[in-house]
């Protein structure tokens, strides 16, 4: 019977296993970092998209208020510059400065006004004694400023600035501008 001597250099050494594990660990750490970056960029994009939608919806609301005659052209103004002549109700105007963005339009039914955070209370009727200011209706991290400028007797510039969280812990601003004429008919008629 013949005995064969095993080659001592066959197989994997402990050193090779440790090196392979080290390379794999570095690769997995890099993958984890890239996933974190992807989530941050995704949040940033989502917040920017939401901000654009908020700004555009407010600009479109101004045209709808005029077209449906819920407000007259003179009433679409900041507080202190409202002309209630010929209106069916007195409107106080859109507040100046940055204010919370609410999920509720408040008792006047118009987003962007000073009453947006008013909760009707337990009776669910506005204007009763149980109404209260409900800050939970504000969209966390978001605020807006509405500036309405009269360019002529028949033309207004509406500028909406929205402050929003960018997903990286910073607050950014998005500015949207539109022009509103004193003609409730659609431009294509």
Give the ranges of each region predicted by the language model.
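N-terminal leader/signal peptides at the extreme start of proteins
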Residues: 1-12
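Exposed boundary/loop context
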Residues: 4, 20-23, 171
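Aliphatic-rich helix starts adjacent to a transmembrane/signal segment
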Residues: 10-56
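Low-complexity, Gly/Pro-rich coil/beta segments used as flexible assembly/activation regions
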Residues: 49, 53-189
